[in-house]
Amino acid sequence: MLVVRADYKKYPIPVLEKMRIDEDEFYKKYDACVVVQTCNRIEAYFDTEVNSDLNCILNDFSGFDILKGKNATFHFLKVSCGMDSMILGENQILGQIKTSFQKARELKKTSRYLDSVFLKAIHVGQRARTETKINEGSVSIGSAAVELAEKNFGLANKNVLLIGAGEIGTLVAKALMEKHIKAVIVANRTYERAETLAKELKGMAVHFDKLKEAINFSDVIICATSSPHYILKKEDLIDVGNKIIIDIANPRDVDDAVREFENINLYTIDDLRNISDKNLQKRIEEVPAVEKIIDEEYDVLMKQIEKINVEEVLKDFNNYIEEIRTKELEKAIKLSKTKNPEEIMENFSKAFAKRITHDFVSYSINTSKEDLMNSAWWKNGK
């Protein structure tokens, strides 16, 4: 297997957005492949038995990191467990892998090998989350903000406004995905980024000049921009009704003067740090247990793949034998009018054996014993 990947560790989110794969075009060009794309990760998985032209892949994915073989497989198992995520142990990636895999299967773009790898990755991700505590507690400022809002005020059937669609806003979005929220609105100065994030949340994007209307509509407001100036000032929040505002931006998005309004509860990043730091440490302590699961399941996967390889070799060999049998039988049928049956059968059996022996000898002359034992010589001997 080969993986091409680009993620938040190497590129900022605006750059990743420009690197996103056009999946319609991708699946038209390649077979035996699966694309997994999220707001902070772009990855494509290839079965290299089918996609043997690696130069073509490398040219199409300039700027992407490349992983092959064992490294690619281990990487994918870690991804499914949330070990490679912006939020350690996050749950959303497992659902995104399932959705991506299902799409590729519906398009008939997977292979028997990729089916085994993806089903195993999904199983490993499920084990990690049920047998360890890798996904428990809020570990980012973004998820801590959502946890605080839910714990103190409840989010069920609430309207939430997220101001900011950058890195921190994305973390908030990931946490919101798990909640039963009535509606989510995303506002950002760059409307296209708001639109992209809103789509993932199944929410609605608004232009910044419609911020006042969005505030009036919302029950909870989470501010997470990178603006050097206040986004919400006291005069912006006059007569807006009861609001919960959680400001996790640095520098601050909300003027502290809004605390003067009795109908507004304002929380800042300082209220959340202790929550996220403590939970992150708990998750880090679970990493060895998850790695043990990955090691166990990797060994199981390799045995499954070895079985698949043997079955494919036997299938190819049977096809090879059938091809020779058919050709020699055609010759025998042509001779049936001029020779007796015993002579025809004698010639047929000798020709059949000679063809197999000839192909094997021709290939083995210049092949080492080890390579010969590991090769499908009948393919090369044709």
Swiss-Prot record:
Note: During catalysis, the active site Cys acts as a nucleophile attacking the alpha-carbonyl group of tRNA-bound glutamate with the formation of a thioester intermediate between enzyme and glutamate, and the concomitant release of tRNA(Glu). The thioester intermediate is finally reduced by direct hydride transfer from NADPH, to form the product GSA.
Function of the protein: Catalyzes the NADPH-dependent reduction of glutamyl-tRNA(Glu) to glutamate 1-semialdehyde (GSA).
Site (Important for activity): 75
Annotated residues for binding of NADP(+): 164-169
Keyword terms, alphabetized: NADP, Oxidoreductase, Porphyrin biosynthesis
Organism this protein belongs to: Methanococcus maripaludis (strain DSM 14266 / JCM 13030 / NBRC 101832 / S2 / LL)
CDD domains linked to this entry: NAD_bind_Glutamyl_tRNA_reduct (cd05213)
Assembly description: Homodimer.
One Gene Ontology molecular-function label: NADP binding
Free-text note regarding domains: Possesses an unusual extended V-shaped dimeric structure with each monomer consisting of three distinct domains arranged along a curved 'spinal' alpha-helix. The N-terminal catalytic domain specifically recognizes the glutamate moiety of the substrate. The second domain is the NADPH-binding domain, and the third C-terminal domain is responsible for dimerization.
Gene Ontology terms: biological process: protoporphyrinogen IX biosynthetic process from glutamate
Domain of life assignment: Archaea
Catalysed transformations (reactions): (S)-4-amino-5-oxopentanoate + tRNA(Glu) + NADP(+) = L-glutamyl-tRNA(Glu) + NADPH + H(+)
Amino-acid positions noted as binding substrate in the UniProt annotation, renumbered to this chain: 38-41, 85, 90-92, 96
The name this protein goes by in its record: Glutamyl-tRNA reductase
EC number, as in UniProt: 1.2.1.70
Pathway(s) this gene product operates in, as recorded in its UniProt entry: Porphyrin-containing compound metabolism; protoporphyrin-IX biosynthesis; 5-aminolevulinate from L-glutamyl-tRNA(Glu): step 1/2
Protein family membership: Belongs to the glutamyl-tRNA reductase family.
Active-site residues, as the UniProt record annotates them: 39 (nucleophile)
